[in-house]
């Protein structure tokens, strides 16, 4: 088989949800946008529901429809992008809860689905999604008559607990939501770890569920093993890959593995990246190609059948570091060509 195998440990995923749930005294939801961070939303969300999650968040309404088909009736599914033009039928038919981000969305929702649940997203300083203070004041009286199912905001710097922006956003959120009776939510994974001041009525862990930072106590959820297509001897002075970026200075044994930037192993990893055969770390040589990567396996006593990129020796965040990026980008980029194997 020439397809890399992405093994997803559902028991670890569920354990991470339970661990994050134990860190607060409030309801713990689960963020499963981007196909559950690339791991397969139907299977992942079902495991999280079995662990106890009853509220899920997705990025767009289409993701919510797919999730509803996987989970069936019952769990609440909230949509971060709110009520976009053209989403009305999806929201209604799949029983989704749009997180209203603007006055225009508020008007659209009330006119199209006057009896349908909605939430509110407020901007407390990130300047991304949500109503600013003036907008919120303009619609607050109307919006809270229902009341909304949830009022939320999102922290910009929760991965840096000491950053002054966290307290600034907390204070802003408290001020903007004074005297409302609706449940409130501010914390994703990083906010959960900053303590009860940030927890309010519901937390929304995402990356921590899948084994990523800043949740350092997370169990690893993914393992990526890539098959070796071919192994060859390379002599001193010979080069490997596009643009001759790596030249052998001694006799070398080079394996070509079946994955590349089309599979989410981004080109920026380059020669910083390492793979493993057992406990032996092996360097990438030459450029990462669309479908192929060269690895120096000279240190091994025999040619390997496969090499491991993500697993017990290096996490998603370690691999992200090879490319000076974040674990989120690597995880959500892991491509459709991988064979996904789920274990319990």
From Swiss-Prot:
Keyword Acyltransferase: no
EC number of this enzyme: 5.1.1.1
Protein name per its UniProtKB record: Alanine racemase
Alphabetical GO biological process terms: D-alanine biosynthetic process
Catalysed transformations (reactions): L-alanine = D-alanine
Binding residues annotated for substrate, in chain numbering: 128, 290
Assigned protein family: Belongs to the alanine racemase family.
Organism, scientific name: Roseobacter denitrificans (strain ATCC 33942 / OCh 114)
GO molecular function, one term: alanine racemase activity
SMART domains: Ala_racemase_C
Function according to Swiss-Prot or TrEMBL: Catalyzes the interconversion of L-alanine and D-alanine. May also act on other amino acids.
SUPFAM superfamilies, A to Z: Alanine racemase C-terminal domain-like, PLP-binding barrel
Pathway: Amino-acid biosynthesis; D-alanine biosynthesis; D-alanine from L-alanine: step 1/1
Residue list for modification N6-(pyridoxal phosphate)lysine: 33
Active site per database record: 33 (proton acceptor), 242 (proton acceptor)
């Amino acid at each position: 088989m020439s397809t890399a195998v992405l093994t997803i440990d559902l028991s670890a995923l569920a354990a991470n949800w339970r661990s994050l749930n134990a860190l607060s005294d409030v309801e713990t939801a689960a963020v499963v946008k981007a196909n559950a961070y690339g791991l397969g939303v139907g299977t992942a969300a079902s495991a999280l529901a079995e662990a106890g999650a009853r509220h899920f968040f997705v990025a767009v309404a289409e993701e919510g429809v797919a999730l509803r088909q996987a989970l069936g009736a019952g769990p609440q599914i909230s949509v971060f992008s709110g009520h976009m033009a053209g989403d009305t039928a999806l929201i209604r038919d799949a029983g989704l809860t749009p997180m209203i981000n603007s006055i225009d969305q508020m008007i659209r929702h009330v006119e199209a689905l006057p009896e349908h649940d909605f939430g509110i997203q407020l901007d407390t300083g990130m300047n991304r999604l949500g109503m600013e203070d003036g907008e919120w004041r303009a619609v607050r009286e109307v919006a809270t008559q229902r009341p909304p199912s949830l009022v939320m905001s999102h922290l910009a710097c929760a991965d840096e607990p000491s950053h002054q922006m966290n307290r600034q956003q907390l204070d802003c959120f408290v001020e903007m939501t004074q005297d409302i009776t609706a449940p409130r939510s501010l914390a994703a994974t990083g906010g959960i770890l900053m303590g009860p001041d940030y927890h309010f009525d519901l937390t929304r862990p995402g990356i921590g569920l899948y084994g990523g930072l800043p949740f350092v106590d997370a169990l690893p959820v993914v393992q990526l093993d890539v098959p070796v297509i071919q192994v060859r001897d390379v002599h001193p002075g010979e080069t490997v890959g596009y643009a001759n970026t790596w030249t052998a200075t001694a006799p070398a044994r080079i394996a070509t593995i079946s994955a590349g930037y089309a599979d989410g192993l981004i080109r920026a990893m380059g020669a910083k990246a390492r793979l493993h055969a057992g406990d032996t770390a092996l360097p990438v040589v030459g450029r990462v190609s669309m479908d192929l990567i060269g690895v120096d396996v000279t240190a091994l006593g025999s040619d390997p059948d496969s090499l491991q990129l993500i697993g017990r020796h290096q996490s998603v965040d370690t691999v992200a570091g090879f490319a000076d990026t974040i674990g989120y980008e690597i995880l959500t980029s892991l491509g459709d060509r991988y064979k996904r194997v789920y274990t319990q």
